[in-house]
Amino acid sequence: MAPPRPDYTFTHEHLLGIEGLHPLDIGHILDLADSYAEKTRAGVRPDPVLTGKTVVNLFFETSTRTMSSFEIAARRLGAHVISMPIANSSVKKGETLIDTAMTLNAMKPDALVIRHSASGGAKLLSRKVDCAVINAGDGTHEHPTQALLDLLTIRRVKNRIEGLKVVICGDIAHSRVARSTTMALHLMGARVHLCGPKTLIPPGTETWGAESAGTDFDKVLKGADVVMMLRLQLERMNGSFLPSRREYFRYFGLTAERLALAKPNATVMHPGPMNRGVEIESTIADGPSSVITQQVEMGVAVREAVLHLLAGGKS
């Protein structure tokens, strides 16, 4: 963990995306998250900095993994947690996001964690409430805590981020993870290369900070320090993006043979959930190069840090 910066103060009221963050902000969050990760591994309970605080998880899209991670993080810090999956909310009865925001705001929560299918949903919510808003994924736009946990995992495994070659392969077009993680890695000095079928690479990836975006997975893997595979988000696809899953795996699936093209100590990542045999074979997902379970572990630590900073008082 880096020494504290006496001249730095975290001033953000919300975490809506990586866009708008400074490298010092990211470094500060990672340092605090690193300290929480170390406490957890040592079996030490963190200080209850959120005692008396209420955190509401408002998930318009289902995600057991992300919601559970935020719940555990908030409870570890002493917060009272209310989780509202869409199936149990009045949104099913026709209530709009703004109506929901105004209703929840009247209950005076200290933080709202939102996942929504519409890009910009978190930003809209932040304009209607008086508490901290944390974006847990908004459409194909951003997923900032996933990006931060990815960076924390990389930093702990590689002892640095700056200068690393990171290859992100898969469904770039529908992935908020690709966007957020690329921007965060770029801000911290990594060299990011995106890869996938031509139909799944959107225009404008250079504005995220990507050095390249192409279709030759074998070529871009050469010299890679980190390889991150992305899930095919079939639920977001309306057209014929792929000929078949088998064909996709043939050209873009991560196999032992393909991984050998990267550096010998290359690290394999995946934000989950995985489609084994589609974007990655099981021997790689479960092998010694994989840090997929560490990503889940670091997710709780990052969310502890974010909740601490936004709901527990900035430090």
Swiss-Prot record:
Record: residues binding L-aspartate: 93, 176, 231
Enzymatic reactions: carbamoyl phosphate + L-aspartate = N-carbamoyl-L-aspartate + phosphate + H(+)
Gene3D superfamilies found in the cross-reference section: Aspartate/ornithine carbamoyltransferase (3.40.50.1370)
One BP annotation, GO: 'de novo' pyrimidine nucleobase biosynthetic process
GO molecular function, one term: amino acid binding
Superkingdom per UniProt: Bacteria
Family per record: Belongs to the aspartate/ornithine carbamoyltransferase superfamily. ATCase family.
UniProt function note: Catalyzes the condensation of carbamoyl phosphate and aspartate to form carbamoyl aspartate and inorganic phosphate, the committed step in the de novo pyrimidine nucleotide biosynthesis pathway.
Subunit structure: Heterododecamer (2C3:3R2) of six catalytic PyrB chains organized as two trimers (C3), and six regulatory PyrI chains organized as three dimers (R2).
Name listed for the protein in its UniProt record: Aspartate carbamoyltransferase catalytic subunit
Organism: Hyphomonas neptunium (strain ATCC 15444)
Lineage, broadest ranks: Bacteria, Pseudomonadati, Pseudomonadota, Alphaproteobacteria, Hyphomonadales
